[in-house]
Amino acid sequence: MAKKSKIVQNERRREIVARHAERRAELKAIIKSPSTTPEARVAAQSELNRQPRDASPVRVRNRDSVDGRPRGHLRKFGLSRVRVRELAHQGQLPGVRKSSW
């Protein structure tokens, strides 16, 4: 079980990313556009740097939705590998079967 503070911190980061996503996308489009003037590009870069660090999506950590475990996360289920195994053995994941060949 992850610390409650880490889970809350990650949720706060998700909210900040969502709040700043549109403006970040606009600034990145200005920076990447070949038709942008150098002055406008520098202005967009400085504005992007002024945004909070937590507004960057790479700072969000994928965590297990049940207990917040940060490692071994499977996107398909939103759970950690440990939790997927437990729930699959209990038959609580529809369509998941133990493999045999």
UniProtKB/Swiss-Prot annotation:
The gene coding this protein: rpsN
Entry GO terms, CC: small ribosomal subunit
Region (Disordered), start-end ranges: 31-73
Taxon lineage: Bacteria, Bacillati, Actinomycetota, Actinomycetes, Mycobacteriales
Record's keyword annotation contains Protein biosynthesis: no
Subunit composition and interactions: Part of the 30S ribosomal subunit. Contacts proteins S3 and S10.
Superkingdom, taxonomy of origin: Bacteria
GO biological process annotation, one example: translation
Function: Binds 16S rRNA, required for the assembly of 30S particles and may also be responsible for determining the conformation of the 16S rRNA at the A site.
Comp. bias (Basic and acidic residues): 61-70
Keywords attached to this entry: Ribonucleoprotein, Ribosomal protein, RNA-binding, rRNA-binding
An example Gene Ontology molecular-function term: structural constituent of ribosome
Keyword Cell wall biogenesis/degradation annotated: no
Protein name: Small ribosomal subunit protein uS14A
Organism: Mycolicibacterium vanbaalenii (strain DSM 7251 / JCM 13017 / BCRC 16820 / KCTC 9966 / NRRL B-24157 / PYR-1)
Protein family (similarity comment): Belongs to the universal ribosomal protein uS14 family.
